[in-house]
A protein has these predicted regions:
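A short, polar/acidic, helix/strand-boundary loop motif
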Residues: 55-80, 285-311, 338-347, 351
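Polymerase palm active-site segment centered on the conserved acidic dipeptide of motif C
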Residues: 5-6, 10, 92-94, 103-180, ...
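Catalytic palm active-site di-aspartate
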Residues: 28-32, 66, 89-114, 148-156, ...
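C-terminal reverse transcriptase regions that engage the nucleic-acid substrate
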Residues: 144-260, 384
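Catalytic-core region of right-hand nucleic acid polymerases
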Residues: 1-75, 172-220
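Active-site palm subdomain of RNA-directed nucleic acid polymerases
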Residues: 71-125, 316-334
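RNase H-like nuclease module associated with reverse transcription
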Residues: 197, 319-416
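Metal-dependent nuclease catalytic cores in nucleic-acid-processing enzymes
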Residues: 10-18, 77-86, 307-329, 358-366
Length: 416
C-alpha cells in the first residue's frame, strides 16, 4: 500500500517538473556504496557492538544505518552536499538516500550554454563546488550531463513536455512480472511472498498509472488473508486476477505517460455532498441543489452509508464534468471521514466503494481535476437536508444533463 512518506517522495519532483520554466534541465548523481562508504572512527567502535541471533557479538565497522533516523552516517554527508550546493546557488535539489538530482534554470547572464539557453553552471562546475567532500560518485549510474529528460527514483521525467512515465526497461520488467504471475497462478495456489512481490511493484508504478490505484485493494485484501503465514498457499480470487489482467493490458502500452500540471490554487465553488440511507443523496453546487432518491432495494452486502457518501462525490464529479469544469483544484465538503480518506488514497478495501472510486478517478483524470476533500459537520452541511428529502425550490435546482453509469442506474428511483 502507499505510505505517506512515499507519496511525499514522488510528489516533490512532480511539483518541480510541473512548474519548471522553459529550458529547465536536470542532472542525476548517485553515491557509490552509500551505506558502506563512511567507516566508523576506531575510537567509537567499542560502543557499536551488536548481538546476533546466535548470541555472538559483532563490531559494526560502518554503522550503515546510523544511530538515529539519519539515513546512515553517509546520509549526513549527503545532506551536507545539499546544503553546500544550495549555499552556492546550485538549486533546486532533490535527494533520496544516495540519489541526488539538481536542476538548472535558464538565466540571462549564464556562461554555460545549451541550445538557446544560458545557465549558471554545468555538471563539472556543480561538482567543483563540493569537491573538498570527496564524495565517491558512481561511475555507471547517474547522468553525464544536464538534459531535458532524466530518470529519478525509478521514473522518467520529461521536463519540456511536463510528464512522467516508466523507463522502458522498467515497463517491460513490471509487465513481465505481471504476466508471469498470471501464467503461474491463475487457477493455482500462490504464496504470500508471490503476492507481496507483485503488489509492491504495482504500488510503485501506480504513481504513473493513477487509475491503477483502485486495482490494488484486491491484492492487499488477498495479502491480509494469509495472516502473515509465509508458508500458506492460497488461490488468488477472481477479482485479483481481473485486476492483474487490467495491469497487464495497461503496461503493454509503451507510450503511456502521466501528464503533470502545476497545482492551481484551491477554488471553493461551494461544493457539498451528503447521503442518507433513509432517503438518498443531496448535492450542492454554488448554492444550487440536486438530489437522488434511493430505490428500496438499493442495499446489498457491502453497500453502506460510506459507499453512499462516496457515490455522492462520484455523482458530483459527473455534474462538474457536464459543466465543463477542468484543469483546477476544487474544495469538496463531506461529513464522512471514511469517504474523505478513501478518495484521498484512491482505493478502499470495500469492493463497492472501490468501484465508485475507480469511476470517479476516470473523471478526475479526464478533466484534470484535483479534489481537496474537507470535513464539514452535518449541521453545517447544506446538502444534509437535501439528502433527507427536504428539497429546495425549483428555481435553485441544478439543470445540467448527464447520465449515471450502468452500475448506478438501478440504485436510484429518480433524479428529483
Amino acid at each position: 500500500m502507499f505510505i505517506y512518506q512515499s507519496y511525499l517522495l514522488i510528489s516533490v519532483p512532480s511539483i518541480q517538473v510541473a512548474s519548471a520554466p522553459s529550458g529547465t534541465q536536470a542532472c542525476t548523481f548517485d553515491i557509490e556504496k552509500f551505506h558502506r562508504t563512511c567507516p566508523v572512527h576506531p575510537a567509537h567502535k567499542p560502543w557499536l557492538v551488536v548481538q546476533g541471533l546466535s548470541d555472538k557479538f559483532y563490531i559494526d565497522h560502518t554503522h550503515p544505518f546510523g544511530a538515529a533516523a539519519a539515513s546512515s552516517n553517509a546520509g549526513m554527508i549527503a545532506n551536507t552536499v545539499v546544503d553546500i550546493w544550495q549555499a552556492e546557488g546550485v538549486k533546486p535539489i532533490l535527494k533520496y538516500k544516495d540519489d541526488l538530482k539538481i536542476f538548472r534554470y535558464p538565466v540571462d547572464a549564464g556562461i554555460f550554454q545549451h541550445d538557446e539557453f544560458k545557465y549558471k553552471y554545468d555538471r563539472d562546475e556543480a561538482l567543483s563546488r563540493i569537491s573538498s567532500l570527496l564524495v565517491p560518485w558512481h561511475k555507471d549510474k547517474g547522468d553525464l550531463s544536464f538534459s531535458y529528460i532524466t530518470n529519478f527514483i525509478g521514473f522518467c521525467w520529461d521536463l519540456p513536455k511536463k510528464r512522467v512515465s516508466l523507463p522502458e526497461e522498467k515497463r517491460l520488467k513490471f509487465h513481465n512480472r505481471v504476466r508471469i504471475f498470471l501464467d503461474s497462478f491463475t487457477g493455482r495456489r500462490c504464496s504470500l511472498l508471490d503476492v507481496q512481490k507483485i503488489h509492491g511493484s504495482l504500488c510503485h508504478v501506480a504513481f504513473v498509472y493513477v487509475q491503477g490505484r483502485s486495482r490494488l485493494p484486491s491484492l492487499s485484501n488477498f495479502i491480509a488473508s494469509f495472516m502473515d503465514n509465509e508458508f500458506a498457499l492460497r488461490y488468488p480470487p477472481h477479482s485479483m486476477i481481473t485486476d492483474l489482467k487490467w495491469w497487464l493490458s495497461t503496461l503493454d502500452n509503451p507510450k503511456f505517460y502521466r501528464k503533470l500540471l502545476p497545482r492551481s490554487p484551491c477554488h471553493d465553488m461551494g461544493l457539498f455532498v451528503d447521503a442518507s440511507t433513509s432517503w438518498g443523496i443531496g448535492i450542492i453546487v454554488a448554492g444550487k441543489w440536486t438530489a437522488f432518491r434511493l430505490h428500496q432495494n438499493w442495499k446489498v452486502e457491502g453497500r453502506d452509508i460510506c459507499w453512499l457518501e462516496t457515490v455522492a462525490v462520484e455523482i458530483l464529479l459527473y455534474i462538474l464534468e457536464a459543466m465543463n469544469i477542468n484543469n483546477t483544484t476544487l474544495l469538496i465538503h463531506s461529513d464522512n471521514q471514511g469517504t474523505i480518506g478513501s478518495l484521498g488514497k484512491g482505493r478502499s478495501r470495500n469492493f463497492h466503494i472501490n468501484l465508485s472510486i475507480r469511476r470517479a478517478y476516470v473523471v478526475l483524470a479526464s478533466q484534470f481535476i484535483t479534489p481537496e476533500l474537507v470535513y464539514v459537520a452535518s449541521e453545517n452541511n447544506p446538502a444534509d437536508p437535501i439528502s433527507r428529502g427536504e428539497l429546495g425550490s425549483l428555481e435553485s435546482r441544478i439543470t445540467v444533463s448527464f447520465s449515471l453509469p450502468d452500475e448506478l442506474q438501478h440504485v436510484f428511483l429518480d433524479v428529483s
